[in-house]
Every structure is written in structure tokens, then in C-alpha cells.
Amino acid sequence: MMDRSNAAFVLTACFIFSQLICHVAAITRTYYIAAVEKEWDYAPSGYNKIKGVKLEDDSDATVFATKGAHRIGRIYDKVLYREYEDASFTKEKPHPKYLGFLGPILKGEIGDTIVVHFKNNGSRVYSMHPHGVFYSKDSEGALYEDNTKGKFKKDDKVPPGGTHTYSWHLTQSHAPADQEDKCITWIYHSHVVPSKDINTGLLGIMLICRKGALNQGQQSGVDKEFVALFTVLDENESWLLSKNIERCSDPTRVNPDDEDFKESNKMHAINGYFYGNLPGLDMCYGDSVKWHLAGIGNEVDIHTAYFHGQSFTIDGHRKDVASLLPATFVTASMKALNPGKWMLNCLVNDHYNAGMYTLFNVTKCPGKVGVAPSVSGGKKRTYFIAANEVEWNYGPTGVNGMDGQSLIAPGSDSAVFFAQNAQRIGGTYLKAIYEQYTDARFSTKVPKPEHLGFLGPVIRAEVNDIIEVVFKNNARFNFSIQPHGVFFNKSNEGALYEDGTSRAQKADDNVQPGQTFTYRWTVPEEVGPTKSDAACITWVYHSSVDPVKDTYSGLFGPLLTCKKGTLNNDNTRKDTDKEFVLLFTVTDESESWYHEKNKEMKANAILINDDDEDYKESNKMHGINGFLYANLPGLEMCLGDTISWHVIGLGNEVDMHTAYFYGNTFTHQGSVKDTVSLLPGVFGTLTMTPDNAGDWALVCRTNDHYSAGMQAKYKVNTCNRNPELKTSGKTRDYYIAAFEMEWDYAPTGLDALDGKKLDQSEEAKVFTVTSDKRIGRKYVKAVYREFTNDQFNQQKLRTPAEEHLGILGPMLHAEVGDTIKVVFKNNANRNYSVHPHGLYYSKAHEGSDYNDGTSGADKLDNAIQPGKTYTYIWKVPERAGPGKDGPACATWAYYSDVNPIKDTNSGLIGPLIICKKGKLKEGTEERSDVDREFVLMFTVLDENESWYLDENIKKYCKNPGDKETLKADDDFMESNKMHGINGFVFGNLKGLKMYQDEKVDWLLLGIGNEVDMHTVHFHGQSFLRKQVSYHREDVYDLFPGVFATVEMVPDSTGDWLLHCHVNDHMVAGMETLYSVLDKSLKTTPKPITAASSFVTSSIFIYLSFPVLAMLLKA
């Protein structure tokens, strides 16, 4: 009988043999690709094909598409990747029309090698840099100081007329995870100066597939594959701008810095086409379709791609909208079951107006059989809904519910929006809203829950149901109802665009005042919740005659589709005690159909300048369900209730929201959270069982939105239930002080990625060089630091493993069941606190300063005075951990919450890590399940919002002049926005070192403002994100108030770039290096443990059959 050691040895040998077989079966896929200069037309038809008008007759399109004395128009010179037949680069391969300006699609299976022979036919240096594959330093194609030279630098910038051969290996360490699609989406692009290279046009898509997924280069089991890249191509940032200016009829008088000229060159495109001009998105009714979707670009590049008339799945979840940020790549699986011409558009309002839409065509093809989705055995649910005009008050109490001040108190944040005078409308506006009636007479309204505010009634249905909406338009403008998440034909879509239908089929799209139309929608299995979804998934309906003006006018509501058996006979939920809907949006009343009427009613219209920035700002109402500054009523529940929160985002580029629920956590798609990020057209279902009684804040964690009133409160009553939460684990003591120090954002004095001194770098000196009216790289800040005892007489020195933390406070570790005790001393010169995310705390230990109905001792934690000490006690229940479907440890944060905007920008934030039981070494806070963990905070620390701005001006500016004038200067304010990682810029973050094949956890933190959308990209490696199942990525999307854990086993040695992929953030220094050392350099070999036994097939691909034979013989 074989003993255990021999059995293990044979199993290992068999595994190696299987890897070798895979490697033998692998192939080399060779591509010949050149960078070539071509003329590119963004709208070759000359028409807005969605509206059916010439571009010059469309007021929105003329901004971008009309050529003039000082306008380039719609045709630009670009440099594009194109594929050729062979190394002679003489015969270009056919390029699918729908790919537009994108390069060819590169495909390969795990085990393959992709070899790209690249020729640069452009007029300056370019390269090819891939995402999602294994490469060595001579095939990275990215220019930065990575401590290589010679042959390892030739890939970084290929000169004009030059060639380079890139070899990219598709190892198991970059394979699609088990529950992912067979082929996952990545990109490749030039990375010499990536922001300019990409805007010039050098970008393409790459698909990495499981073994056996491709059949003669095509994905098996898929009828059609399409690629769609959403981006605002900024031609101002193209290398060919000067050449393109020559296209103007009076080029010598063009001012490239003119704001209107720059705006005209921002092309809101899908695959390089706008206003419906993207061709070739044709499929057959019944086709199985894969959509490979990507985003790239800058801070404006928040895209939500909406497919009318169809649904799809991403990561097993039912959707009809895909969220795309710079360097976000997703694969969507669609069954084309709804014939017709359908719109594909970005739901961000400005992007829609700027032409980011096209048509895709689902046709009944000869010989192709499609089965129409049908419903049977369900109910017919009828709703009578009217569009009514009402006066809406965004602050009906007249009071800021968070601090008790009047909404019109002079100098308050709220007065900007609520003060009424001859040139300001104030807080009450005429709007159109959806309201429900009892029957078709539209005489008796159905009462609605007060928390819904200006939202329309909740439409609910189960799978197999029919929804009938009898809609009456009582308003003065044409309106409609367009739904998400249900099945409808062209006569029931409710969206007005040129889709080839007859006039009779368009009655649903444009319901006139006083008219009635009946919509009929169904909920077949094909559009219902998947097994991975919540019992009811969240959608919206809204008017779509003009989707921008209609929604800003107030016409939207929630729609829920539920699994069979979820609803009671009265349409309420069986599985929940309460259900709440929350819409986070900045309602731009200047874009409402009623804007002119509101000026007449509430102000003196003659005196108002519509283009005045302060006036426009006063009309941007940062609300939750149409209420600001904690005026939202009705969010009340009992301890232990099952609560379903349905959260919705709508709006514009600024509508990047992170909803934060103080005091309790929820589950969302298998993850335990207390924040959820929302973009326009993003909807989510959250499940909460509140265990913490009290009045709790519910806010948007984006700083400007918070200060502009996107705040509410929800109340958890005890309802005679026991609120006591018991923990049985350890008590972990931490001694933390806040104190002021001088912080240096770039202590080396170098732009480490460029190899230049800071004052010699055009980009770096904007932020880091001191002058008469510039602070430079050093600022006084407040930071959290750990001490050894409650006397605070000895600061705890940071170890080499903690060097990377930078400005962050200490890592606080605990396991589920533990209690955390933080003895906090405020050694700074103003009030601060410590507030944790995710944990269980009483009101006396929340560390947050707002009106929560408490007094006395329960208020002492809110703001600790200088020189004082306070002890916070936080418990760690199961719902504070990563959950059964999450990673080993969940990432949270703690920060001062007296004034969360100024406190965090002053520097007071740190990481909080909560692990499953048994993941911390006995007697320590060290992890037992990983070799290393690193915390990375990506944020633009806005020193203009620091408490210490005046002190920093006085201390560091050499000749500041009038302080208030300086503080209002745009260039000065920009110089104080430090685009950092852990408080370091331009490659100055140190300490990110690891060895090959170690298990590494990266703990990611996001905080900040509207610009703080960060796409964290690791060169050289990929990582796994766990959300029920694993997902392979090399870019992670971070928003303010979002915290995440990702897992990596690095296999490619070298010094690698780690950066935010948002263009302006890269340019402003949000990048650094991390080092992967050869495993042979480890001084002390570690025993094989669960943490170090990760194996990737790339380790074995160099083994030979003789080696295997020796192993087996032994």
C-alpha cells in the first residue's frame, strides 16, 4: 500500500504531466501589426442617424462635427493599429467595419504564446503594451524607469520605421477564473506617453480564453462577437493636434487654449464613431452574442452602456447596462431575442447629448430559428400612472437635519441652493412627476410611501407576469414611459429615435398632453433575476422623449422584477419586512423643461444670466429622492427586520455616488459592505438586517455631494427587541494619537518614474516646486500614529512591512468575534475623532458629529478636544467580516468624522482589516494566510480643503501676497491637489516588495471627491477579486468610500508600474513602482503552508519530459 508521501509525490507528478500536455498542445499565434497614420471620420454619413437629421442641423452635434475657421470638424488624422498579412507589411488584412478606429482583435488560449511583430509607421515613437498576459521586461511596451537597460528597453519605444517583436505568454496565472466566461476581455495600447498615445488612436482589444475555447480563431458556442469601446477621445491631447488644426479654414488664428475650441475636439465616441454612425452591429434573431466592452480615458470617462430592448449577464447577474471606467473591461453574454433596430447609448447625460450612441440590429435571418420569450402562469399587473405637474420643495422643513441650521443661514453650504432672490430660484421648483391612480378615470390617487419623494410609484412584477401601464400625460410637454429590465416590442418601448418603425409604432414614444397610452411589458425567464441575483432586482422607468430633459424634469420611478413566488397577493414582498428605494442624483434644474417657467415664478427672469456659473450651481440639487440636507422622511424600521434597499443612480458626469449607511452593513451580490457605488444608470439591490438601534446618517461619501446636501438619516427602533450584541473573541488594544507633522509628498526630490528632478519635470513641478505663490511638495498635516501604551510617551516604530503605509494611520486588525479598543489621544490643535466603517458601535463610540437624537455621554465621542483622550470600543460581529463568499479578510477604513471632508484632506485616515476566524497569528495582528499584505489609498488629497491651508501658505509660499486672492486663484488651487498613493506622488512611495509566487493581498482604499474615480492598474501581474466567485483582473475600480481586497500571486519578476489609469491622474503623479524579486533570493525558505502552496502552470512550462520521467522513477 502506497504511503501518504509517495501518494502525494505521484499526484504532484501527474499534475506536472498534465501541465506539460497542455503546454505541448499550445500554439504560437503570430500577428503582424503596424502603427499607421490614417484620416478618420467620426460621422462619415454626415447625419445624426438617431434623430434622422444632418449634423449641421443638430445644435448638439454642430459643436463637434462642423468645420469652420477655428474648428476642425469631424475628420482628424490619427495613428491606428492595423494588421498585415506578413512581415513585409505591404498587404493590410481586412478590418471589420464595426471595430472602427480600434486595432485588430488579438486572441489566444491558455498555454499559447502571442507573438506580435510590430512596425512603427508613425512619425514618432510608439509601442504596444498588453493587459492580462504574462510578459518579461523586453515585451512590456511601457516607458518608465524600471531599472532595466539594453535589450529590455527596446520594447518601450519603437522609433519611426523601426520594428520590435513582442512575446506574450498566456499562462494559467492569467486564465479566466472558474466561474468566468470562456474568453475574457483585455486591451492593448501604446504606452510611451499613454494619455497622448491613446488619444492619438493606438488602442485595441485582446481576448484571453480557456483551453479549447477557440475553434479556428472563433469562440465556440458563440454566434457573434462584438467589441465596443466607450471613450471621449480628446483630440487636444493627440500628438497630431497641430496637423489637425491645419484643417481649419483659418488655422493661423486658432487658439489651442480656447475653452470652446478644446470642447469641440472632445469626441464622445463608440469605437471612434458618434451620432449613430457606428456600422456593422448586425446579428440574427436567436443568436448567442458576446459583447466585449471597454472604457478608457480621463475623469469624464464614466460610461454606462445601455442596450435597449435586450438584456444580458455580466458575472452571472442580469443587466441591461454595463458600467465602464478608464481601463475597465467586461464581457457581457446576450441572447438576441428581440428583433428590431435598437439603440446602444451611454446613459451619462452630457455624453448622450454629445453623440455617444449608435444602433444595433437584430434581424430574423433565413434558416435561423429564434424562440420568442413567452410568459405563462403569471399575473397581469395593471398600473394607472399619470405625469402631473407639481411644485416640489427640496427642503420642506426649512432646516438642515444634520446640524439644525436654517437652510438659508448666511454663509452656509445650504444657502447656495435654498436662498431665493431676484437672481435665484431657491429650493422650490415646478416639476413633472409620475403619480399612481386607482383606475383609468385618473381621479383618485394611490397613496405612496413618503420616502419615495418625487419618485414615481414602485412597479413590481414576478417572472412570467404581464405588466400593463395605462399612462396619462397631464403635463404640458410630450412625455412617455420607457422601462428597463422587462421585455417589450417596438410599439411599447417608450423611447423616441429613428429605429425604422412606422408612425403607428411610435405612438408609445411621444404621448402628447392630455393623451393616454397603454404600455404592455412582460417578464419572461430570459429577462428575470438569475440564480446569482437577489430575489428582486432593481430597475427604473423614465420618460424618454428627450431622456435628458425629461428626467431632469422629474419623470422617473423604480421597477422591480422578482423571482417567482416572491410577492404576496397585494404586491408586497414575502421575504422582507420593509422595502426602501433611494435615488441618488444631482438634479440639474437648468436642464429641466420647466426652467424658464421656474425663473418666471420664483425670480426675476430678466435679471438672470443663464451662463453665470454661480446661478447654474444654485440649480444643481444634490438630492436623495428629491430631498437635501436630511429632509428625506420615512426611513424607519425595527431592529432585526429584513430590509431591502433598492438604490438607483441617474444623471451626468458628476453623478458618481457612494451611498454610505452608518451604523449597519448590508450584503450586495455576495459581499458585505456599508457603502455602494452608483453611476448614472446603475441600479442595485441591498439586503440589510439592522442590529444597531439609533438614528443613523445615510450620505453620499463623495465630498462635494456631501457638502451640497446629499444627506439623509434612517432610524432603527428597538421595537422591544434585544439590541445587545455579544462577542466572544479577543479584545485588541490600539493606542493611537493624532498629531501635526510636516509631510513631504516627494521626499526623494525626483520624479522617480521619469528619472528627472522635480523641477525639471513639466508635470511634476506644477505640484511639487515651491515659489512665491506655490506651496510645493511639503505641507503641514495631521496624521494618526500608533503608540505602545496609554501614556503616549513612545511612538511605535513602523517595520519594513509597514513602510509603504505613508500618510496612513496604522493597520488595525481583528477577527470576526473580536472587540477593538482604540485609546485615542488628540495631540493636534483642533477637534478630531476616530470613526470606523463596517463595525458595530454604540452612539458613544461612533466618532461622528451630526444630529442623531443623542445627548450627554453619547456625544463625547463626536469631537475630541486638543490634548484630550477618549476610548472607543467597537465590536466585530459576523456582518463586519468578509462573509462566507468573500476573501479571507475584508478591508474597511477609519477616519476623523468631525468634518469628514476637511479632516480626511488634512490626513486623518487609516486601514481597518477584519478577517475570518483563524486568519491572524496567535498573539499578534499578523496574517497567517498570506505572505504579505499592502494597503494602497488612491486619492487626490485636496490641500485647499485642509484645515492647515492658511498655515501652509504662510510657512511655504515665498511671497504669497493677499491670502484670499491667492486662495481663489485656479492655478494655485490646482497646484494643491496632490494625486497620491498613500500620500506620495511621482513614484515616491517605497516598500512595495515581494517575492515570486508569494501570496499577496492588496487592500485598496478610495476617498475623496468627484475626480476620485481611480482605476488601479498593476503592470506585470493579474489579480483575483472574490465576489462569491473569483474574477481575473489587472485593474480595480475605486470610488470615494469604497474599500476592497484583491489577491495576487506574482509570477513575473521585475520592478513594475502601479498607477491609476485615468489619464490626468497618471500625468499628475498617481503612480509608483512595486518590486517582484526572484524567489531564489529569499534568505530563509518558508515551510509549505496554505499561504505558500499556490501553484501556477507558468512554473512548470519549462520542465521537460526527461525531468518528469526522473520524478516518476524516483
Curated annotation (Swiss-Prot):
One of its GO terms (biological process) is iron ion transport. The chain crosses the membrane at residues 1092-1112. This is Hephaestin-like protein. Its main location: membrane. May function as a ferroxidase and may be involved in copper transport and homeostasis. It is a single-pass membrane protein. Residues 1113-1114 are cytoplasmic. One of its GO terms (molecular function) is copper ion binding. Cu cation 3 binds at H191, H1019, H1059. The keyword RNA-binding does not apply. Residues 1-26 form the signal peptide. One of its GO terms (cellular component) is plasma membrane. Residues 27-210, 218-365, 380-562, 572-719, 730-915, 924-1114 form the Plastocyanin-like domain. Its EC number is 1.-.-.-. Pfam families: Cu-oxidase_2, Cu-oxidase_3. It is found in: Membrane. Binds 6 Cu cations per monomer. Cu cation 1 binds at H129, H1017. Its cofactor is Cu cation. Belongs to the multicopper oxidase family. Glycans are attached at N121, N236, N361, N478, N489, N831, N944. Cu cation 5 binds at H657, C700, H705, M710. Cu cation 6 binds at H1014, C1060, H1065, M1070. Cu cation 4 binds at H303, C346, H351. It comes from the Eukaryota. It comes from Acropora millepora.
